[in-house]
């Protein structure tokens, strides 16, 4: 169904591309906080995953709108079919693995920091109680 509608495919591609761009922008804006927390490897993996996903959907838009202008419609359709049948799997796999790895590294690091803060708060509360 989606495959039969260029407008629907383009809408999905653009939506995914916009979400990836917004997420990358958000990661970039908060990169210093990630660096301060020691979670830069996680940030980098998330950026790679989002970029891979974005590049795939950008290539899909290229095969839908630019390639037909440069070659025949049949060649463009064959390229789009090749993109979806042969290249979508590795791109999705790389994207998901990088996003999962990035989230795992980042959440592990941030949970360690939360644990440190909780212990520090508890220690401080104990010291305040003893000093009263």
Which positions does each model-derived feature cover?
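N-terminal membrane insertion elements
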Residues: 2-127
């Amino acid at each position: 169904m989606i495959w039969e509608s260029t407008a629907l495919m383009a809408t999905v591609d653009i939506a995914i591309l916009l979400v990836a761009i917004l997420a990358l922008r958000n990661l970039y804006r908060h990169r210093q906080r990630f660096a301060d927390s020691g979670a830069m490897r996680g940030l980098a993996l998330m950026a790679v995953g989002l970029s891979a996903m974005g590049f795939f959907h950008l290539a899909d838009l290229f095969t839908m709108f630019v390639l037909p202008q440069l070659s025949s419609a049949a060649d463009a359709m064959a390229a789009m079919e090749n993109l979806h049948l042969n290249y979508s799997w590795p791109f999705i796999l790389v994207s998901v693995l990088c996003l999962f790895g990035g989230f795992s590294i980042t959440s592990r690091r941030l949970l360690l920091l939360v644990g440190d803060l909780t212990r520090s708060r508890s220690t401080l509360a104990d010291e305040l109680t003893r000093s009263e």
